[in-house]
């Protein structure tokens, strides 16, 4: 009996083991592995250009240490020395949009980059989490969630946060806020079963608060400063606040009629509200020249609403992608002291034609308004060279035409600005060297800018700005040692000398080690980012207008900035450490990035980027 029980138990255990093995085989064979290759996205802009390929998630360590807009753009932007502060493109003075706009755009970067429309196809639930913990009370959070309900529907949301303490004249060691910014986006994407209908919709809410101080109180005649005391600096203003709110509702529909012929409609409803508040009249009054509405306190605001609808036809004829459309925009705005809103209506026709072959790519993009204003862009691209030409007549922005606040008021009738730009570059590639000389020749007539008096001015002469430079990339020892660099030399015409204030020399370099440690399982990068520019009279910032203006008194000294970094990756987790402004060897040393606003002093920063699947 005992033998039989033993045999029976053995048989039972054998059956059990066989069952477990069978289950394991079934589990391993049926289990789907979700990861980098199963979660993809496509931008709506690329979709409209006919590029319908989904993009795999970025898992590279390259440039992961760059957080602020000026760092990400090789310091071709200026800011107020802190993350989340208003920014200005140093080298590009031309309107970024053809359609009439508010013109209050110093915070555009934080809104546009985070609210970009993307079509996600993630298969499984997907999370993209980015955390930045900067020294001196600076932090950023980017959270993206997306999941496929089924193979045809995807939903998700984004949350983006920026928080930063004051870096100069802080009233306490921690928590004296300079920046509070948040953006929330809810989106849905649908592709029908027969792949004829594409639907995308999103809702975006953006709030950006700046608790400013007008910069440090120094006389331009006392420059350069020998000591940067940061928290002990006196400031030009106290307890002022800028607050900008934006909302956006977008509904996009695309329908394929037949192969090569599709129709679409893209609808937007947008709001923008900008406020400037200063209730500290006693201390701040000497800063202002005029008081038009109140000599006790300032509460300026502008409210803008716009409805935009674009209807078009797009498709593919052989090697030619085409997109022809009509664009309608209704815009109304209201200032603090206005009882009735001002209304604008705008209509223009546009088209994009792209002829693509393996050897080269030709693109033509044109827009024409009923007023005669136009935009024309042509590009020719091959493996060896690229050349582009742009010509356009751009109407003044609302801000340039009309403004009503407590400290500034104007009502202008300006001509459209006439812009011409020619760009070209050559690419020379070998196994270890990429050399790419480039040139940009630009001219603009009837240029509109904020003058030193902080009022719009239109210059009727032709202004010329030319840029010559070279991009150089090197990789040595089987791509273990790498160098990425860019140098530009900038010139302006005599008529532009006090209007286009740009550094004559500008250099960016990234020298880094790239390899794998711990039995080739952990990718690692470490190195230095270097930025060098020559001295120039950089544009200054006016808080009450939330805008940059031309000035010719405050000289920004030549400076070299070095950021040391170390980055590593463990599966879906990437981490970096960065010593920002490592080249500040003396704690009282420093420089100005914008008149009256010092650069970030030396701090240690930590960043994390983590993907989660299923």
Regions from the PLM with identified roles:
Residues 164, 171, 177, 189, ...:
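Flexible loop and strand-edge segments within Gram-negative outer membrane beta-barrel domains
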Residues 1-66:
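Sec-dependent signal peptide cleavage junction
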Residues 122-124, 244-280, 296-614:
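Exposed, low-structure sequence patches enriched in small/polar residues
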Residues 37-47, 52, 59, 130-134, ...:
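Outer-membrane beta-barrel proteins
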Residues 29, 51-52, 59, 101, ...:
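Coil residues (strongly favoring Ser/Thr
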Residues 88-102, 117-133, 263, 322:
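Transmembrane beta-strand segments of Gram-negative outer membrane beta-barrel proteins
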Residues 71-83, 93-114:
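Flexible, glycine/serine/threonine-rich loop segments and coil->beta-strand junctions
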Residues 109-111, 120-129, 133-167, 179-184:
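Outer-membrane beta-barrel translocator/receptor signature
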